[in-house]
């Protein structure tokens, strides 16, 4: 029972929409997204990667980093507040992930 191309495309688009609207939830997992879409996590990861060249987890991280960079540029919020507002539970881990993504610390980026 193979899913149609249209069905796989819709799953990928819905996955992107969920990530783009729920990225700020620290407990958002790819398993949660797969459950919301009524598909297996492994299947979701495979088809998402086919369509976007990145895993859902990588896309979630990218969305979080881009939103964090916007907040760093446009607000005076503390790095800690920004970390929490883009879905990180640990501001130190956020700073490390941000530096890996942008090759700059959040404070240097600002």
Predicted regions span which residues?
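Terminal helix-turn-helix DNA-binding modules in bacterial transcription factors
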Residues: 17, 21, 50-92
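Short helix/strand-capping hinge loops at secondary-structure junctions
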Residues: 22-27, 55-56, 105-106
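…primarily DNA-binding HTH/wHTH and HhH modules…
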Residues: 96-110
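Short, Lys/Arg-enriched, Trp-marked, Pro/Gly-tolerant hinge/linker segments that flank
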Residues: 1-17, 35-37, 50-58, 62
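The cytosolic transmitter module of two-component sensor histidine kinases
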Residues: 8-12, 30, 79
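Residues within helix-turn-helix
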Residues: 31, 42, 78-81, 91-92, ...
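Core residues of bacterial helix-turn-helix
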Residues: 36-37, 86-87, 98
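Short hydrophobic/aromatic patch on the recognition helix
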Residues: 43-44, 48, 93-94, 98
């Amino acid at each position: 029972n193979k899913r149609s191309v249209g069905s796989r495309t819709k799953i990928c688009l819905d996955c992107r929409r969920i990530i783009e609207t729920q990225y700020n939830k620290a407990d958002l997992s790819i398993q949660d997204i797969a459950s919301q879409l009524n598909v297996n996590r492994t299947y979701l990861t495979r088809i998402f990667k086919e369509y976007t060249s990145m895993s859902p987890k990588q896309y979630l991280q990218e969305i979080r980093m881009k939103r964090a960079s916007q907040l760093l540029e446009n607000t005076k919020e503390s790095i800690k507040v920004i970390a929490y507002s883009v879905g990180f539970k640990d501001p130190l881990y956020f700073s490390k992930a941000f530096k890996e993504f942008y090759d700059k610390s959040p404070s240097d980026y600002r």
